[in-house]
Amino acid sequence: NGKVYSINLGRVIYSGIYYNKQLFEQNKIAVPTTWPELVAACETFKAQNVPCMTAGGKDGWPIFVGAYGLIGAMYPDQAALVEGLWNGTIKWNDEKSLEMWTKMQVYARDMMEEGASGIAGDAAPGRFASGAVAMFPGGSWYAPAIEAAQPTFDWGYIPFPGSDTAADNQYWFGKYDQGWAIASNTPNKDAAVLYLKEFSDPANYQAFVDAVGFIPTQPTAKLNTKIGADIAPFLGNFRVGYEQYWIAPKGAGQFANPWASYFKPFGTDDDPKVLADKVQADLQAGLDAVK
């Protein structure tokens, strides 16, 4: 009803790519800002027998979450994407979406290192921190694990360059994460309010976001972390991501999602057009059911 009902503790970004600064410098590769530059970088690394990307493919979700930035680059207005899918002005098998699927196949099939499907999600940060892989697409929450695995490892974090146009690749996509709320009928209201007051003390909140790696939502806080320095230039372009808006229509099929993990070797699909038609058909089944 227009009132505050919880205190949000921070934001997370899931649309970026961690990159190994030393490998980029050694191979004289510029940090990519467009999709063609990303493709060229991966081809150069592979020619030098350096795996381009890694991710926790064994767990499934890190593969499609790793490509959320690609979806954002193609559809920067994520709320409009969801609205368009519901009203039919955007389809997962239209020309623009087919470009997205084609790029997703390149990402899953050609950019991911061989064997990524056997890497657990919690092992991927350590694999990247070992220095053996050039890039690691994933969320901002991985940064503390990377630093813990190898404190001296020199890495950076960039928006996923999924568009052919650099200006479209300057957004962060993510979500507002954990929050505290106080039940209206709690017998401990005074204690709960006092806890939130202490938690919101600038020094306490700063220590919290530094420790957990959240992007702060309290105006008093600063981006003190290593990843914060890379996030800051584009933080004004932070947008809530697709999956926070999306509510699938009841009756939609199991493939009604924009997931890169459908492609081999993580899934069974190997034709972008066939997959696009399948995804749209599964979505359409749900849309037709709720008309």
Please state what every model-predicted region is.
Residues Q26-N27, R109-D110, A148-V212:
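Extracytoplasmic/periplasmic substrate-recognition and gating elements
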Residues E25, R239-K291:
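Conserved C-terminal helix/tail region of periplasmic/extracytoplasmic solute-binding proteins
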Residues G121, G138-A143, P159-F160, Y176-Q178:
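Beta->alpha turn/N-cap motifs
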Residues G57, M74-E99, A148-Q150, G162-Y171, ...:
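Short, solvent-exposed loop/beta-turn-alpha elements that line the ligand-binding surface or hinge
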Residues N1-T33, V39, G57-G84, K175-A181, ...:
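Periplasmic solute-binding protein
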Residues Q48-C52, S130-G138, P151-F153:
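Alpha-to-beta junction loops
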Residues E43-T44, W86-S117:
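Glycine-centered hinge/linker elements that transmit conformational signals in sensory
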Residues T33-A40, G115-A129:
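Short helix-initiation/N-cap motifs at beta->coil->alpha
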